[in-house]
């Protein structure tokens, strides 16, 4: 359940710091959040599959690490990103 090219481009355009920015923590966290939300919707009716759940846990942990990094580097960018994405932290 990966994101389409158009969805990725829209997310990158919305969260990038400068033109062509695809590697900033904000962009990476936004892409991971979209992937996590899409995978959660897929996993609701199918409760017996363990491999996608494992992938979901890996994505959540990776997003948490990126958010911890951003929180240590710049707390204002961190709090702005949390507010824009609607994450609980």
From Swiss-Prot:
Spell out the InterPro entries in the cross-references.
Ribosomal_uS15, Ribosomal_uS15_bac-type, uS15_NS1_RNA-bd_sf
Coiled-coil positions? none
Question: Is Transmembrane among this UniProt entry's keywords?
Answer: no
| Alphabetized Pfam families for the sequence | Ribosomal_S15 (PF00312)
The record's keywords, sorted A to Z, are: Ribonucleoprotein, Ribosomal protein, RNA-binding, rRNA-binding
Query: What's a single GO CC term here?
Result: cytosolic small ribosomal subunit
Give the highest taxon in the source lineage.
Bacteria
* GO molecular function terms noted in the UniProt entry: rRNA binding; structural constituent of ribosome
Q: Does the keyword Cytoplasm apply?
A: no
Which SMART domains does UniProt cross-reference here? Answer: Ribosomal_S15 (SM01387)
Q: Which GO terms describe its biological process?
A: translation
Record note on quaternary structure: Part of the 30S ribosomal subunit. Forms a bridge to the 50S subunit in the 70S ribosome, contacting the 23S rRNA.
Family membership noted in the UniProt record: Belongs to the universal ribosomal protein uS15 family.
Function comment:
One of the primary rRNA binding proteins, it binds directly to 16S rRNA where it helps nucleate assembly of the platform of the 30S subunit by binding and bridging several RNA helices of the 16S rRNA. Forms an intersubunit bridge (bridge B4) with the 23S rRNA of the 50S subunit in the ribosome.
Checking PANTHER family in the record gives:
RIBOSOMAL PROTEIN S15, BACTERIAL AND ORGANELLAR (PTHR23321), SMALL RIBOSOMAL SUBUNIT PROTEIN US15M (PTHR23321:SF26)
Protein name (database record): Small ribosomal subunit protein uS15
Origin species: Pseudomonas putida (Arthrobacter siderocapsulatus)
